[in-house]
Amino acid sequence: MEMETTEPEPDCVVQPPSPPDDFSCQMRLSEKITPLKTCFKKKDQKRLGTGTLRSLRPILNTLLESGSLDGVFRSRNQSTDENSLHEPMMKKAMEINSSCPPAENNMSVLIPDRTNVGDQIPEAHPSTEAPERVVPIQDHSFPSETLSGTVADSTPAHFQTDLLHPVSSDVPTSPDCLDKVIDYVPGIFQENSFTIQYILDTSDKLSTELFQDKSEEASLDLVFELVNQLQYHTHQENGIEICMDFLQGTCIYGRDCLKHHTVLPYHWQIKRTTTQKWQSVFNDSQEHLERFYCNPENDRMRMKYGGQEFWADLNAMNVYETTEFDQLRRLSTPPSSNVNSIYHTVWKFFCRDHFGWREYPESVIRLIEEANSRGLKEVRFMMWNNHYILHNSFFRREIKRRPLFRSCFILLPYLQTLGGVPTQAPPPLEATSSSQIICPDGVTSANFYPETWVYMHPSQDFIQVPVSAEDKSYRIIYNLFHKTVPEFKYRILQILRVQNQFLWEKYKRKKEYMNRKMFGRDRIINERHLFHGTSQDVVDGICKHNFDPRVCGKHATMFGQGSYFAKKASYSHNFSKKSSKGVHFMFLAKVLTGRYTMGSHGMRRPPPVNPGSVTSDLYDSCVDNFFEPQIFVIFNDDQSYPYFVIQYEEVSNTVSI
């Protein structure tokens, strides 16, 4: 692929590298950041307007934070060989396979809005702590974290800010001033009377050759070409897919790509009645609409726009009760049957029966459709090594297709777009399943309390500290919670870490006492992380006094008169009463289950291990099923600790577009 260049004007003479004050920068600009080409001239230097600067700031700021411009700029006052500007510094194969031919097309350019999506991107943090080890057991634990709330990681993090070196010390260059850093590129960014000069940094040995044998001017041109390639755009025509190469950061055609360039693998648009033009839904509402649409139980959704409300039919994709819009559409990537594919669209098929919508494989759905069309009374098929018969005698079965929902929280670490620049790939989803536990070397700090705890005044009985979405603990809790609570039905609002020194000390001492009587696997599975649903009015009381077995019976006492905990969040959700604002509350608690036995309604304490001895130890807990326990009941308040509080809500049927 040949790179387009800008012919210099007749009076432009190419000079050897010299101070940038002798050059000027000219570039072609349109209303919304079209491809930028630089032409350096002597004397009169053209500056970009404030509006253009503000439009470019989030783009370049994201590039700086993500490391996309690693090694590009370096201060002029650093000693370096002048010829080093032309030495190879990166080795990148430019022959990228792409199915996107360049062509003229009708499109609209979408300026990235980092306040809507980009702010959710987690950042990598350096750490020197020991690596983690994985031990297969039937429960979860959480990794050790630093005092600032970041997670220990053995992989060294790479920071773009370390490659930016200012000429003058009076110019702000701290990580908190990244918005200022991008204003200091020579001849391009100048604002608020600050000016700083940078040259290309070719000393670092990176893995690509993007700037090999390139002058400073040509390298800056490549930077702007990169910015052009990362811009978002959509086409007005129907039947066009989202470019998967763009999502993976490998589309080299930029705004000339015939496919859509969007933040996520899905994108919602609505068509205006007067102009018959498609316009994108707000970034904040993209995930909301997708989440609601993925639920097969939802057929229509209420929409708000400019003070008016109307309805959208999610089956026919029509809009009614308004004259402003008439149609709705969902842009998506190519389909795939692999549920582990991050970039593809995975379709799920549902058939309605007496109990609601039930998911079936696509092959079974095709059989049901054929039976409906031919008027057959029953459908026979085999699924999961079992034979099934569906009777169609009294009604025609309704069939529906909806995509598998993937939240921004799950997608963003994998996306190579401006709205989803990855920091570090998260662990595979199966790594946080109920069959494994993450055990760092040194689970507590030297002062006996978790390293993630922040300072609390001695007069405080407890505090609740919000858990950052960047923490590994957040991801573990998120995946464990949504393993049984569908993401398209409920959305996590906040996760709080409970700090109560008194309760923690009691719990730790009880754990040490129980561990002295256990060995091997029994000691490992002694501690579990289980859910407990409750109402808002008792959350603070539990955080201060712990779960109290004496007040049992509020919801159920089927397996004993104690405190109930469940492996599945879906079970605990049944006992989580929503507040007046529609918020549900659920604890993820540390529970010492120890040795357990089958429970019964009349038990006020666990039965003895050896009924024939008056000095026999008691069982530590009771369960609903001895072989595959899902519910645990404890009778002592020092066997549990209210570790995290999960606040979540039901997905609303109203979205602002």
Curated annotation (Swiss-Prot):
Domain WWE: 332-410
Gene Ontology MF, one: zinc ion binding
Family matches, as InterPro entries: ARTD-AVP (IPR051712), Poly(ADP-ribose)pol_cat_dom (IPR012317), WWE_dom (IPR004170), WWE_dom_sf (IPR037197), Znf_CCCH (IPR000571)
Documented effect of changing residue 564 to A: Abolishes ADP-ribosyltransferase activity
Top EC category: transferase
Residues found modified as ADP-ribosylcysteine: 39
PARP catalytic domain: residues covered: 449-657
Chemical reaction(s) catalysed: L-aspartyl-[protein] + NAD(+) = 4-O-(ADP-D-ribosyl)-L-aspartyl-[protein] + nicotinamide; L-glutamyl-[protein] + NAD(+) = 5-O-(ADP-D-ribosyl)-L-glutamyl-[protein] + nicotinamide; L-cysteinyl-[protein] + NAD(+) = S-(ADP-D-ribosyl)-L-cysteinyl-[protein] + nicotinamide + H(+)
Inhibition and activation profile: ADP-ribosyltransferase activity is inhibited by PJ34; inhibition is however not specific to TIPARP and other PARP-domain containing proteins are also inhibited by PJ34. Partially inhibited by KU0058948.
Enzyme Commission code: 2.4.2.-
Gene3D superfamilies per UniProt: 3.90.228.10
ZnF locations on chain (C3H1-type): 237-264
Result of altering residue 631 to A: Does not affect ADP-ribosyltransferase activity
Gene Ontology, cellular component aspect: nucleus
Keyword annotations of the record: ADP-ribosylation, Glycosyltransferase, Metal-binding, NAD, Nucleotidyltransferase, Nucleus, Transferase, Zinc, Zinc-finger
Annotated consequence of substituting residue 532 to A: Abolishes ADP-ribosyltransferase activity
Biased composition, class Acidic residues, residue ranges: 1-10
UniProt modification remark: Auto-mono-ADP-ribosylated.
Main location: nucleus
GO biological-process terms attached to the record: androgen metabolic process; estrogen metabolic process; face morphogenesis; female gonad development; hemopoiesis; kidney development; negative regulation of gene expression; platelet-derived growth factor receptor signaling pathway
UniProt-reported outcome of changing residue 39 to A: Slight reduction of auto-mono-ADP-ribosylation
UniProt motif (Nuclear localization signal) ranges: 41-47
Assembly, per entry: Interacts with AHR.
UniProt family annotation: Belongs to the ARTD/PARP family.
Physiological role: ADP-ribosyltransferase that mediates mono-ADP-ribosylation of glutamate, aspartate and cysteine residues on target proteins. Acts as a negative regulator of AHR by mediating mono-ADP-ribosylation of AHR, leading to inhibit transcription activator activity of AHR.
Designated name of the protein: Protein mono-ADP-ribosyltransferase TIPARP
